[in-house]
Amino acid sequence: LRLKSIVSYAKKVL
């Protein structure tokens, strides 16, 4: 799990 991937996903969700 990559931190950048999580951040990008969070931006899409929010």
From Swiss-Prot:
May be secreted in hemolymph. Keywords: Amidation, Antibiotic, Antimicrobial, Fungicide, Immunity, Innate immunity, Membrane, Secreted, Target cell membrane, Target membrane. It comes from the Eukaryota. One of its GO terms (cellular component) is membrane. One of its GO terms (biological process) is defense response to fungus. It is found in: Secreted; Target cell membrane. The modification Leucine amide is found at L14. Is the only mastoparan described so far that does not belong to the order of Hymenoptera. Antimicrobial peptide with a broad antimicrobial activity against Gram-negative and Gram-positive bacteria, as well as against fungi (MIC=15.1-28.3 ug/ml for bacterial and 19.3-24.6 ug/ml for fungal pathogens). Shows low hemolytic activity against human erythrocytes. In vitro, shows significant cytotoxicity on HeLa cells. Belongs to the MCD family. Mastoparan subfamily. This is Mastoparan-S. It comes from Sphodromantis viridis (Giant African praying mantis).
